[in-house]
Every structure is written in C-alpha cells, then in structure tokens.
Amino acid sequence: IQDIRLEEAEIPTPGPGEVVVKNKVTLTCGTDCKMFMRGYRYQPPHLIGHEASGDVVAVGEGVTKFKVGDRVVAHNTAPCHKCYWCKKGQHSMCTELPSNLGAYGEYQLIPKNIVNETMFKLPDDMDYKQAALTEPLSCAVYGISNVTIELGDTVVVNGCGPIGLMFIRLAYLRGARVIACDRQVHRLELAAKLGAAETINIDEKDQIQAVRDLTEDSRGVDVAIEAAGLPQVWEIAFRQVRAGGQVLCFGGTKKDTTVNIDCTRMHYEQITMKGVFHTTPQHVNAAFELLKMGAIQAEDFVEHEYKIEDTEAAIREHAAGKVIKNCIVYDD
C-alpha cells in the first residue's frame, strides 16, 4: 500500500444531530501504520486517522450538548444499542459499529451517535494532545477491565508500544507489581517511569524464564498481558502465567493467524486466556476522566510535531518504532 494522499475537499455540513470539528491535533496510531504499510480492514482508497481533538465550528439541528467554539474530543465509534451484541451488553462487538475515520484532515464530521455518547468538552486546563489520547486509552481501560488485578498482584506486559505503556500505567494504578518486556531501551525506560518495577530487554534475556524468575519459586505471574500483536507473544504470555492465572490477548494479529497452546496445562492449571477488542462508551468515559485527572500524560507519549503535509513522514517514523506517537498540528 504505502500511498497516502492529501486532497482538497468541501468542508462538511452537519446534518441533524451531527457536529463539525476543526481539528487542532491528530495523533498517529499503530492502526494507521498497519493501514499505510500493508492495508488493514478497509479497501483503499479510504480516509485515515481516528485520534484527534479540536474546536466545534458547526452544529446540526437538534444538537444541544455542544456549541460553536467548544473545545472537544470525539471518539471514533459509538454502538447502535439495537443489535444482538448490544442487547447483550457487549458493546465492543456491535455489528453496526461505524469507525469514523478522517482525523488526518482539517475538518471532521462527527456522526450523531458519537455526538450523543462518546464526545466530550475539554476542561479549560486540558491540552488538545492530552484529550486526543482518549481513544487509545479507552481501549486499554476496556482491556484491563477484562482481567482481575488485586492489590499486590504481579502483572507482566509484553510489548511497550502506546497501548502496552498504558496497560503498565493502569496496572500500576491498580496496585500491581508490574514487569515490562520489550527490546527497545527508550520504551523500557518510559515503562519504568510509568510504574514498571522491573524491565526486561528481550534481546538480552529469555522472555519467559526471566519473568517467571521474578516471582516466588518461579511460579509465574498472576496476569500476563500481550500487547504486541504477534502470535508468538500470545504463546509466550501463556507460558509466563502461573497456575490459576489470567492471560489477556490484546494485540491484533494478521488474519488467519494461529497459536499453539498446551491444552493440558490450560485445563489442569485452570488458566484463563481471553481476547479483547476495541472499547465501550463506559470505558471511553473512564479514559477521559483519567486524562482529566492527569493519570496519563501526553508528554510521555507524544514525541514529535508535524504539519499536515508531512503526515506520511509522521506515520513512517511511528511505524519504524522510533517514537511512541507523533502529532499532526494544524494551522489556525
């Protein structure tokens, strides 16, 4: 793929219940990198970008929560509340969950369902970059809600990209002793800053044994989190966890990927292994509250600023693993 184009378009006009936002910042994301580098989920040509914040410049008929001039952040999805999965309370699996792409643009049309449920006004003291972290943090908040972490538990996070680092911070805030695994020194240093008690460079140590050796009698961790999107890391996480422990598989792998798991161990040692995808309005709201509190700081995640015409360079630098995230800043 590797073909991103900047084109002029008409500024959108909001329909009933819709809002138009003039973006101030857009953050790069691993999903953007997958779309750009190899194609992902959608058939090109299509819009790209889903982590942005900005100012309301137009509101449609019936909009009462927002007005022109409001500083806002809009998540990229909101569930339909009508499909089978929504009625079961599994909102992340909504079959009518449209992804509102197009954050790499000066203006963005926000659909009615998002305006009503997953769009927020920024407090006066909240930076646009801070607000733009709402979407990725909401995925980490939802992910960590799918495992039980008790005070004093030991949790390993495999992969210290943006989401992995957020998992580290959230596990630390839950009172866990956190172990971070990665091969990049600057990411491991940031992991320690965010709360990791131990860091393991997987190029220097065995990723399984080194983690187990940090637990009593090498029994394994209480919770192992996979945040790399590689099938071999799913298998590694399973082997890091103790009997009766939990494995959370967050990172999405390539289509039709399979993993090998010791079924005997899973059965007799009662290991729980769970996949998790996306987020829900409840967890989007929780993420925004955490950002307002300063539990996660944009300065730890957002490294370089680019102009919109340099979006490709921003994405390439992210895809190469040279930064945690980059930021597109728009002219007034």
Annotate each PLM feature.
Residues M126-K205, Q209:
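Mid-domain Rossmann-like dinucleotide-binding core that forms the NAD(H)/NADP(H) cofactor-binding site
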Residues E10-I11, Q43-G49, E96-G102, I110, ...:
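Short Gly/Pro-enriched turn/cap motifs at secondary-structure boundaries
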Residues V147, L194-T272:
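Glycine-rich cofactor phosphate-binding loops and adjacent beta1-alpha1 units
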Residues C80-N158:
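NAD(P)H dinucleotide-binding glycine-rich loop of Rossmann-like/cofactor-binding domains
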Residues Q184, T253, T279:
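Residues in the short beta-alpha loop(s) of Rossmann-like NAD(P)-binding domains
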Residues P12-T26, G39-K87, K121-D125:
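Glycine-rich beta-strand-centered segment in the early N-terminal region that forms part
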Residues E235-R239, P281-D332:
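C-terminal hydrophobic helical "lid"/dimerization subdomain
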